[in-house]
Amino acid sequence: MTYWNQRTVAKRVSCTGVGLHSGKPATLTLAPAPADSGITFVRMDLDVEVPARNDLVVDTMLSTSVALGAARVSTVEHVLAALAGMGIDNCRVEVDGPEIPIVDGSAAPFVCLIQEAGTRQQRAGRRYLVVDQPVEIRDGDKLARLDPADGFVVDFTADFDHPLVTNQSFRVALSDRAFEREVARARTFCFRRDIERMQAAGLAKGGSLDNAIVIDEFSILNPEGLRFPDEFARHKVLDAIGDLALLGMPVLGALTAVKSGHALNQALVRKVLADPGCHRVVRLTSDADVPARRPVALGLPEAI
């Protein structure tokens, strides 16, 4: 086995569920894709392909949505995080409606799909976006910043007006199976006080205790409790990984985020792509380009 090659899934695998915001049934299929094709969403009901690109982002309210013409795909961040975290460069993500199924609210079901499918190496070198200069964007007390680094690191601080989610931080260096172990199982969350407002806006129609952590004034309403003591911050890390996947390739850089969300994450991606002086794109050509130990899913432990 070599590590410089691009990878795709080895066979078609599917799952079903409901859309978190639409409440509509949805079937998702991960299918092999050619080298250098990247991640592409396919609206099977419309026969339209929507590449996973930042310039196609059309909405960042409570989730990230991409669209090409009338073909929209919503809540893409969890499956994008799973594909990126598991080192998949090329994949057709087929869906039979306007939203990716939320499943259990985390990326773990998509990780399981990828493991079920297996992976296949391709005869093309992986491309990496290498951050050479710091890039930062702020919105009041919110921050998203990328700095040069020898791997891919995410350091997120979540801080909400609630005693259970105050100044909660999580930092992870994405190496080997770190995404699967430390990030993938963290679920999306919401506050009970916000549910009525979200549903009035046409959102969260498919939300339940089966696919989201719900927090009331004092406690967690889910009978099973939390999967991690800092699950909220871990899920924000998951979201950030999915959002940064819209750069179109793995990243070599360190992301620091404070109270950031989908909108600020995508603003950072746009700023990076708009400034060729802050980054460069490299392509691996052989195992000689890869460090001795296995590379991380979203970067390499040593500079290329």
From Swiss-Prot:
Q: Which domain of life is it from?
A: Bacteria
Q: Which Pfam families match?
A: LpxC
Is Metal-binding one of the keywords?
A: yes
> Required co-factor?
Zn(2+)
| Catalytic activity reported | a UDP-3-O-[(3R)-3-hydroxyacyl]-N-acetyl-alpha-D-glucosamine + H2O = a UDP-3-O-[(3R)-3-hydroxyacyl]-alpha-D-glucosamine + acetate
Record-annotated active site: H262 (proton donor)
Q: What is its EC number?
A: 3.5.1.108
Listed GO MF terms: metal ion binding; UDP-3-O-acyl-N-acetylglucosamine deacetylase activity
Per its UniProt record, what InterPro entries does this chain match? Ribosomal_Su5_D2-typ_SF, UDP-acyl_GlcNac_deAcase, UDP-acyl_GlcNac_deAcase_C, UDP-acyl_N-AcGlcN_deAcase_N
The record's comment on protein family reads: Belongs to the LpxC family.
What this protein is called in its record is: UDP-3-O-acyl-N-acetylglucosamine deacetylase
